[in-house]
Every structure is written in C-alpha cells, then in structure tokens.
C-alpha cells in the first residue's frame, strides 16, 4: 500500500481556534447524512443515516449529547485512566460497536505549549504503522473540549499487572519486551522519539500482547539531533537529562527501556528515592543492584543498556540480537496504509482488504459520495473514524496483527515478589516538558 500521511506527516496546526470546529452531529446533522426528503422517508434508513438522524431527533440521544455522555458517533462510559492534562474514558462506537479509548482534554486549559504537544501526539500516532503501537482513529472537537479517539487496550497497564501480581518470569518478560523493542525501533526509524516510555504507557490487549501508547511527549528528531527539553517520568530519566543542557532523543528512549526491563524482571525500580533530588543523585551516581535471581544474560543486558554515557549504551539492534533475546520472535511493522478513505472512491483496483473495508462501509450506508465529500477532513471526521476502525478490524482478522502464543501460569501460581507491593496504588507521574 502507499502511505498517505495526514497533514503531510508534519505537525497539525497548533492553535486550537484554527482547527476546524464541528458539532457532534457534523454541521447541523446535514453535511454527512443529507437532507430528509419524502423519498428518504419511504425507504429504510441505512445505519449511518439512522444514527445521523437520531443525533438530531431522538430525545434519548440528544439528551446523551447534552449531558456529555455522547460525542460524535461515540457513547461515553466510565473513566479508565488519566493523563497529565486529560482524562481517558471508555467509548463505544455506535455504528461498529467497537470499544475505544477517548482521551478528553479541556481546551480552556490548553496553553500554547500544551497545544504543541497535542499536535505532536496526533502527528506521531498517524505516522506509525505497527501492531504494537496504539492507533488513533478520530479527533472530535467541540466548543470546550478535544477528544482523541484511540484503540482500546482492555487488559490494563503493564505497571498495574506487575504492581498487583509481581514481577514477570524471564520467558514472559522476553515476549513482552520483544514487542516493546519492535515498536520503539519502528518509532526511531520514523524519526519519532517517545520520551515517556514506562510501564504505565504499555497496555495489554491480551495476556501475551502489548501496545505502546501515550505519545503526549513525543517529538520528531533527526539522527544525532540535540534536544533540550526534559520530558517524561523522573524514575525513567536518563542521567544526561539531569546533567547536560542537551541530549540525543534515541539514547534517552534506550535508557528508559533498560529501566523498564529491570522493572519487568524484578518487580522494583532500579533507582528509588523519597524525593526527586535524591532520585537525581541516585541516577547520576548510577547506584543500583540487580537481584541474584536475574539470569546472567539478562543481568548483562540491563548493565549494557543502563550505561551513564549515552554513546556507550547498547543500541536497539544490539539489544534485539542480544544473547538473552536469542530465539525470541519480533513483530514486524505493518505495510503503510491509507489514513483517509478517499482512495476507495478514486480507483477500481483495490486490494482484498480494501474491498472488504469498502463493502463494510457501504453496508453501513457510507457511499462513494460521502467519501468524496469527506476529503480534506483527515482525522476530524466521523467518516474517517469509521473507516479507520473497520480497516483495523479487517487487519486484525487477517492476522496482520498476530497475538503471540505462550502458555503462562495463572497469576496465583506466580512468584509474587514482595517488593512490588510498594508500587500498589502508586503511579510514576510524567513531568511537563521544560527547558533544561
């Protein structure tokens, strides 16, 4: 497939007031659904037309919109998480019944710097095509709020799993770490630095499959380019973030991977302190110990990644071919796919999965005319949202997103490391980006 990156792969306009605002019903309920006519009323409405009509006329649906229980084509359920400047709620897409995660931001609290971070988050997610990276489906804007509609990972955070069940076994750690490594490699190959890699930002979709999410601190950085803002969670921060005025983004992500691996195999953090000042001192001194139960190959890998000097750290390719990871399969990036459905109406030569997506859209009542009228709206369109959800569903069904198979012990049989209990109820909060 040919990649068509929304906004040319660059940053979205950072001024919220210049983003195209829309009502939940897409321009007074008529832009996408069309005006009612006698002919329309005589035939059975398509699911798309019925939903669009209900959003204008059905008392229950209108009340849900008024009470904030519905936004666009999504019914909003309970809260499933919170971020630095947002809350995350579970949503149900009314046409496809797909569960989604909706990140909600209050526009009145978005200063210029936060708007830039949000723009980068959207841009980063749309440039990446990997089975272990959370997908962005749609951006919905109202007068007071912004909603990022994303893939839902219902298995919870890696942090929560380890905090409640204890450390992972080394075979399980290898399986999970291989997926994270592959995702981060894909980011770096696309010049994207995550800057907030941690167990709280790794999400389970099944017992053996994880996805990296929360690109709120991500940025585009060319090879060797120096950055000068502190982003992320202090326990995962590389020493150069405390020591130097500039840093190379790739090395900072690599360090965070080392901290993450340590946490996975031990159930504790390598650097622990009661205050940020003491934590900084510990990281700069490089003082940490690895428990004896950790195998020697894993021990050497952790030591090789957590090197104080950035250029002496193991690179991601070396980590992936390291003796501890030997024999572990790595997921591969997906072929770049179209982020906008316009190609479905422009050519008769479509691939099998594209034909299936188009057929499903037509079954829902989304026609070539709707798709043509949708051009230029990118992620800020319910048509695009439906398309991306269906495309992702087709790719999952065709095993383009395969789930690793591994026999794991039940949680009650696992070694519940006592040290992990200190993390129960505690989250590592990411700090706002600030100039070093």
From Swiss-Prot:
The modification Phosphothreonine is found at residue 229. The keyword Flavoprotein does not apply. Its EC number is 2.7.11.1. Residues 74-325 form the Protein kinase domain. The active site is at residue 196. Keywords: ATP-binding, Kinase, Magnesium, Metal-binding, Nucleotide-binding, Phosphoprotein, Serine/threonine-protein kinase, Transferase. Activated by phosphorylation at Thr-229, probably by autophosphorylation. CDD domains: STKc_NIM1. One of its GO terms (biological process) is protein phosphorylation. Its cofactor is Mg(2+). Belongs to the protein kinase superfamily. CAMK Ser/Thr protein kinase family. This is Serine/threonine-protein kinase NIM1. The gene is Nim1k.
């Amino acid at each position: 497939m040919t990649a068509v990156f929304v906004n040319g792969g660059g940053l979205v306009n950072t001024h919220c007031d210049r983003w195209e605002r829309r009502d939940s019903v897409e321009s007074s309920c008529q832009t996408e659904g069309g005006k009612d006519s006698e002919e329309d009323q005589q035939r059975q409405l398509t699911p798309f037309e019925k939903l669009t009509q209900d959003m204008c006329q059905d008392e229950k649906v209108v009340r849900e919109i008024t009470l904030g229980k519905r936004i666009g084509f999504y019914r909003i359920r309970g809260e499933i998480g919170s971020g630095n400047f947002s809350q995350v709620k579970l949503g149900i897409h009314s046409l496809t019944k797909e569960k989604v995660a909706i990140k909600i931001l209050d526009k009145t609290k978005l200063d210029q710097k936060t708007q830039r971070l949000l723009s980068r988050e959207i841009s980063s997610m749309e440039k990446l095509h990997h089975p272990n990276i959370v997908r962005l489906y749609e951006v919905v804007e109202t007068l007071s709020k912004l909603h990022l509609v994303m893939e839902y990972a219902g298995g919870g955070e890696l942090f929560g799993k380890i905090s409640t069940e204890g450390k992972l076994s080394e075979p399980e750690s290898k399986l999970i770490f291989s997926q994270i490594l592959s995702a981060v490699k894909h980011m770096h190959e696309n010049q994207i630095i995550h800057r907030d890699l941690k167990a709280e930002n790794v999400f389970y979709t099944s017992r053996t499959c994880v996805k990296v999410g929360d690109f709120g601190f991500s940025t585009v950085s060319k090879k060797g380019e120096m950055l000068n803002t502190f982003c992320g969670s202090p326990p995962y921060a590389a020493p150069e973030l405390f020591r130097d005025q500039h840093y190379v983004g790739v090395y900072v992500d690599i360090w965070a991977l080392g901290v993450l691996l340590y946490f996975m195999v031990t159930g504790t953090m390598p650097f622990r302190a009661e205050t940020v000042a003491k934590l900084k001192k510990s990281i700069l001194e490089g003082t940490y110990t690895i428990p004896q139960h950790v195998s020697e190959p894993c021990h050497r890998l952790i030591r090789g990644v957590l090197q104080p000097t950035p250029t002496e750290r193991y690179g991601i390719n070396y980590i992936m071919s390291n003796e501890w990871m030997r024999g572990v399969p790595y997921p591969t990036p997906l072929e770049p796919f179209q982020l906008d459905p316009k190609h479905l109406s422009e050519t008769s030569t479509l691939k099998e999965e594209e034909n299936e997506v188009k057929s499903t859209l037509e079954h829902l009542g989304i026609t070539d005319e709707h798709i043509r009228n949708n051009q230029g709206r990118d992620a800020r369109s319910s048509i695009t949202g439906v398309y991306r959800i269906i495309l992702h569903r087709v790719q999952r069904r065709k095993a383009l997103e395969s789930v690793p198979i591994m026999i794991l012990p039940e949680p009650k049989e696992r070694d519940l490391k006592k040290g992990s209990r200190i993390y129960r109820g505690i989250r590592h909060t990411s700090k706002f980006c600030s100039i070093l």
